[in-house]
């Protein structure tokens, strides 16, 4: 009995345990389903909210696109309207100028007709004078007979008396006629000259740009400023030393400034920095390598520019060295006016003027493009650009009219041809235009050039750069000719000569740099 009771208890316990397990498992499964359903609901809610946000952003983007499109269309319409307005204004001005020229031409034709009528009247007057002369001879004969008969004079004495009175009257009449015809000729020549100049200025419209003293280089990011400066300023010192240009790194975001009065140096330095920034390797040895390569490229570019100018202007054969000097003039300025732009303008105006006056247009154009060729050599050789231009054109056997134009446009020689006169007139037109030249800038540039010339004239000087707006001159001395002790003496001599020969505000710092380099290769 006890055994069965124990067995029953065990079975009952097992049944209870199994029941509890099944019930627990069912409860756990129910809770899991609830959690899963809740997670699904949350996921759907999140997905729905994300779709709402995405749709909202899509709507905002579309609205922004529509707004930008409307602004772009409005701006295009405004620009088109301004363009149409300016075009109409230019057409009106051109029509007015054309009308003025027609009026001037009609006036000239009218004056020519009046002159022709005057010539006819003069011929008639001459016929009447001949008739009066015959009558005079007849009366003279009768008077001589009377005088010789009644005044007891010889025929020769009476003739001398009459001729002396007649000579005085004729001299006065001759002087009056000379003054009158001189005035008529002067007025006619002045009107004709004004007509020719009006024709030239209306038929040629050249570009003009005032040269600045700085170049601005845009950088991709401000981090490059530190790399351009380099460790302890080595990179920027190398740049300034080899190029002779001030490199200004200030707080202006994304840009640096190059300052120099010499357009050629500034252009080389600008291209050098642009290539270094593009390459990414900025260090002293790399700077020197890129600088030399850019310098060679610039020389080749100047030769190509000269070739293109000669071809475009149809000047025929010209010596390669003269073409190179023409290309070099792109990097020269006079009174703030670009030398090459000025020469091209003079050449085109001179050709038009020479054509109006019956001269050789091609020869006038050639003389005009070469009239300031000496300015391409003044910074290296010094002296007058007229003397240098005459010397180089004589050396390369240019036409005598070209050499005469170089001398005559500054009054060194009399004008000897129509083409030379056309060049002188065109030079005056180009230079005398309001705003074309700036005297103060030219005086500053001349002082900078004089500072460099004084330093370059000293023995042992390899190169000299006037920097910091003329407040410092940096002199590169040859190590094989100048010792450390002589460097001090050289700096003092340059400073003393600058003090005695130039006028300048403040003071000028003279820095003499002497560097010795030894290069050897390990093989």
From Swiss-Prot:
Coiled-coil residue windows: none
Enzyme Commission (EC) number: 3.1.-.-
Name of protein: Ribonuclease Y
Biological source species: Helicobacter hepaticus (strain ATCC 51449 / 3B1)
UniProt membrane topology term: Single-pass membrane protein
Assigned keywords, A-Z: Cell membrane, Endonuclease, Hydrolase, Membrane, Nuclease, RNA-binding, Transmembrane, Transmembrane helix
PANTHER family: RIBONUCLEASE Y
Biological role stated in the UniProt entry: Endoribonuclease that initiates mRNA decay.
Similarity comment: family membership: Belongs to the RNase Y family.
Regions that span the bilayer: 3-23
A GO term from the CC aspect: plasma membrane
Gene: rny
GO molecular function: RNA binding; RNA endonuclease activity
InterPro entries: HD/PDEase_dom, HD_domain, HDIG_dom, KH_dom, KH_dom_type_1, KH_dom_type_1_sf, Ribonuclease_Y, RNase_Y_N
Domain HD: residue ranges: 339-432
Classification via SMART domains: HDc (SM00471), KH (SM00322)
Location of the KH domain: 213-279
């Amino acid at each position: 009995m006890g055994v069965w009771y124990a067995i029953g208890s065990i079975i009952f316990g097992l049944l209870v345990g199994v029941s509890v397990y099944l019930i627990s498992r069912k409860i756990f499964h129910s809770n899991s389903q609830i959690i899963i359903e809740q997670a699904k609901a949350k996921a759907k809610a999140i997905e729905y909210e994300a779709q709402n946000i995405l749709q909202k952003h899509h709507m905002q983007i579309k609205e922004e696109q529509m707004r930008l499109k409307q602004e772009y269309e409005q701006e295009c319409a405004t620009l088109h309207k301004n363009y149409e307005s300016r075009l109409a204004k230019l057409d009106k001005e051109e029509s007015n100028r054309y009308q003025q020229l027609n009026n001037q031409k009609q006036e000239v034709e009218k004056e020519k007709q009046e002159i022709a009528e005057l010539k006819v009247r003069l011929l008639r007057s001459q016929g009447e004078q001949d008739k009066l002369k015959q009558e005079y001879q007849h009366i003279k004969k009768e008077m001589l007979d009377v005088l010789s008969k009644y005044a007891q004079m010889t025929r020769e004495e009476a003739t001398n008396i009459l001729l002396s009175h007649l000579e005085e009257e004729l001299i006065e009449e001759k002087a009056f006629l000379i003054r009158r015809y001189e005035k008529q000729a002067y007025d006619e020549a002045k009107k004709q000259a004004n007509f020719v100049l009006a024709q030239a200025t209306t038929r040629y419209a050249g570009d003009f740009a005032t040269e600045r003293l700085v170049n601005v280089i845009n950088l991709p990011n401000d981090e490059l400023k530190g790399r351009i400066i380099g460790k302890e300023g080595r990179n920027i010192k190398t740049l300034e030393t080899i190029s002779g240009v001030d490199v200004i790194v200030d707080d202006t975001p994304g840009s640096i400034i190059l300052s120099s009065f010499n357009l050629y140096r500034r252009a080389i330095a600008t291209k050098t920095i642009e290539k270094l920034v593009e390459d990414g390797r900025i260090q002293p040895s790399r700077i020197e390598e890129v600088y030399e390569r850019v310098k060679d490229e610039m020389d080749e570019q100047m030769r190509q520019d000269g070739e293109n100018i000669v071809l475009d202007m149809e000047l025929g054969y010209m010596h390669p060295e003269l073409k190179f000097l023409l290309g070099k003039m792109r990097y020269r300025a006079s009174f703030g006016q670009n030398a090459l732009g000025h020469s091209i303008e003079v050449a085109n105006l001179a050709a038009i003027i020479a054509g109006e006056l019956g001269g050789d247009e091609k020869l006038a154009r050639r003389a005009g493009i070469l009239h300031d060729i000496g300015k391409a050599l003044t910074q290296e050789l010094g002296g007058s650009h007229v003397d240098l231009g005459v010397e180089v054109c004589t050396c390369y056997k240019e036409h005598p009219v070209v050499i005469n134009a170089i001398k005559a446009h500054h009054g060194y020689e009399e004008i000897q041809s129509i083409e030379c006169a056309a060049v002188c007139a065109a030079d005056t037109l180009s230079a005398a235009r309001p705003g074309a030249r700036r005297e103060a800038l030219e005086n500053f540039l001349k002082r900078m050039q004089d500072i460099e010339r004084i330093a370059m004239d000293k023995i042992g000087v390899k190169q000299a750069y006037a920097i910091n707006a003329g407040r410092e001159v940096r002199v590169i001395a040859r190590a094989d000719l100048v010792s450390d002790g002589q460097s001090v003496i050289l700096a003092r001599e340059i400073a003393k000569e600058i003090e005695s020969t130039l006028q300048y505000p403040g003071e000028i710092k003279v820095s003499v740099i002497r560097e010795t380099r030894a290069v050897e290769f390990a093989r």
